[in-house]
Amino acid sequence: MSSFNPTTKTNEAMQAALQQASSAGNPDIRPAHLLAAILEQTDGVAAPVLMATGVDPKEILAEAKKLVASYPKASGANMANPNFNRDALNAFTAAQELAGELGDEYVSTEVLLAGIARGKSDAADLLTNKGATYDAIKEAFPSVRGSQRVTTQDPEGQFQALEKYSTDLTKLAREGKIDPVIGRDQEIRRVVQVLSRRTKNNPVLIGEPGVGKTAIVEGLARRIVAGDVPESLKGKTLISLDLGSMVAGAKYRGEFEERLKAVLDEIKGANGEVVTFIDELHTIVGAGASGESAMDAGNMIKPLLARGELRLVGATTLNEYRKYIEKDAALERRFQQVYVGEPTVEDAIGILRGLKERYEVHHGVRIQDSALVAAAELSNRYITSRFLPDKAIDLVDEAASRLRMEIDSSPQEIDELERIVRRLEIEEMALSKESDAASKERLEKLRSELADEREKLSELKARWQNEKTAIDDVREMKEELEALRSESDIAERDGNYGRVAELRYGRIPELEKQIEDAESKVEVNENAMLTEEVTPDTIADVVSAWTGIPAGKMMQGETEKLLNMERVLGNRVVGQLEAVTAVSDAVRRSRAGVADPNRPTGSFLFLGPTGVGKTELAKAVAEFLFDDDRAMIRIDMSEYGEKHSVARLVGAPPGYVGYDQGGQLTEAVRRRPYTVVLFDEVEKAHPDVFDILLQVLDEGRLTDGQGRTVDFRNTILILTSNLGAGGTREQMMDAVKMAFKPEFVNRLDDVVIFDRLSPEQLTSIVDIQIKQLTDRLAGRRLNLRVSDSAKAWLAERGYDPAYGARPLRRLIQQAIGDTLAKELLAGNVRDGDGVLVDVADGGQKLDVSRAV
């Protein structure tokens, strides 16, 4: 034993054997203990070696455990630390000799297995009787460890390294587990051209996230399987290397490098038969480097890449390629760039049509072609931060998922009936305890009603179950059809043309006819409780859920609401018909789809004296659209008086404090692209601030400090100003031309001038202000009644042409609010009381008192 040099796994097996013998009460450790310990290792090499000899390792393990259980038991002080018996020591000696023959520096578990088989023990007999003889085990070594020698204490991590740390894409394609790739022929052809070169045959796919870089490699795998590639790639294996699993669990320095070296040696040993794919290629830069070492994965593969010994396909985004790969010129020159651009909307629709059947089978629903068109068009218009076709595929996937959830959930009609039945059952239990005649009569009626409702419920449940079963049957048939098509393709590749003919001209057409009949039965039922078809409206609902933008068709209620928008806004903003009409027209244009899709929904400059409703109209629009007057982005331009403050809107430039935080305007719009943006008191801002708004007003876009494009096409931009207040319309327009550059004014949809408020209009504003005060008092259940004479008194004293409606708000606060607060604190008015406001002292003041 002094010369026995075990690997880490062998050492672990010896410790496990000792533990087994000790816990079983065996006086010594025998080869059966070692055999059981070796085969119990989850990531050991002995089990794959046995499988290569045609023996089931689980069966051997079970038999070895039976042998251990049959050994004699003893008790005493030495039982805690049993020794290896002669047979076990002979096995170690045989294993050490075999390791020397193989040129191994350490004894690994599969060599110890051969040592056990060579001896004369019950464990050796067990292996030999099952067919795992010493010679058979020895011959099986190359299938697991190749031509590698054991030169480290952890060689098992290097055996079958390619199988452990990669995924065989060609195998997945052969099994039909890869989605079809539509289009991208030019990019795939370019990848094949680069792979066919003699040296530097390493294409790298670069493009924005979500444009289909990984899909191109999967498309190449499908083509290799179909034989639709040049001779230089026919029959090759395309594997996807998983650097994450290679790094995971590498505890000691150099362990990652050992694993990577084993993978590279295995690829090199395949003599060009293996093409390697690394997704997120930039991760190889720095992977495995530790401390002072510069030997990362990128540097390890450079020589192989240059010599053409490693055919590598990479995929990474533009930013990460620039950040990691381009910095290392020696690594960059070994790759050939293949740029993958974003597909057009038409191309994206083609891609969706190719994937449609896969998603129909997975979700068990049908997807209309018009829904695919809507997904491509709506995602292109409204989801600007992501790229086609990924965002369109996600829309279709989520819409189908939403529909499937509705099919699996109980319909609304059944839910409502179940609630009614539960309520009636509770009433029945309560009435059954009463003994008076009225209660008994009511109980009889209730039982009759309950029986009717239960019957209705059972009918509805039966209908729902039948419809659900019909939809599920179609889904199962589609799954079977896909499996048969995959089987047909495999049979064709294997040359089994009899089976191909049987499937393609027999079972597949028969199943297609059954699916067609089943789907037509589902369609015939017009009063169906369930819908199993994804429509453009379903897609639009998902877009609305993602972005908050109402992209779907307008319902009847919304149409009427939009047609009456002036009246709704006019109830809150009095006497400004021109402004209300301009904003209402902009919103209607947007919802009807006739607005320019490349500009904001509307951009307005509101001019007029203070207190006439400029800011109030912006709040009213926000309340109309979002049912909350605070649901808008408000930028107080008085805070942007200095030139440098423009950076606060779009975010600080690189190198400045706050660069990573984004801008106050751009971040807010990025989070809520469908909103009202109010720039209040614009004349107080520095003139340079308006230069950044030029692109927003004209193109509906703005680039923030981090280079991201923010979409303003679904916003309503409102700028308010007091410029020229008090002058005529012409004087106000002249003041605007003096204050703002012509290119800024020219980009606005409209410059709306607010008129001064008349005394008559102030009377209407009194009602609005009183209603707001009443709403604030609702929490204390106070019923506020203001007499007509008190309203007239407020309108008369609150009118000031120079200050608009704001003096009226202050007057209501002083004349009613202050007095009411004192009455509440004194206890003269309590929660739930009525409060009367009337004129007192001959019209000198208002009296606020508890209503009798």
From Swiss-Prot:
Q: Where is this region: NBD2?
A: 558-756
Residues annotated as region Repeat 2? 84-147
Instruction: Name the residues that bind ATP 1.
Output: 207-214
| UniProt-annotated stretches for the region Repeat 1 | 6-71
- Keywords linked to the UniProt accession: ATP-binding, Chaperone, Coiled coil, Cytoplasm, Nucleotide-binding, Repeat, Stress response
Compartments (UniProt record): Cytoplasm
Q: Name one Pfam family in it.
A: AAA_2
Region annotation (NBD1) maps to 160-342
Linker as annotated region, ranges = 343-548
Q: How does it assemble?
A: Homohexamer. The oligomerization is ATP-dependent.
Read off the domain note.
The Clp repeat (R) domain probably functions as a substrate-discriminating domain, recruiting aggregated proteins to the ClpB hexamer and/or stabilizing bound proteins. The NBD2 domain is responsible for oligomerization, whereas the NBD1 domain stabilizes the hexamer probably in an ATP-dependent manner. The movement of the coiled-coil domain is essential for ClpB ability to rescue proteins from an aggregated state, probably by pulling apart large aggregated proteins, which are bound between the coiled-coils motifs of adjacent ClpB subunits in the functional hexamer.
Supply the PANTHER family for this chain: ATP-DEPENDENT CLP PROTEASE, HEAT SHOCK PROTEIN 104
Q: What is this protein called?
A: Chaperone protein ClpB
Q: What is the lineage of its organism?
A: Bacteria, Bacillati, Actinomycetota, Actinomycetes, Mycobacteriales
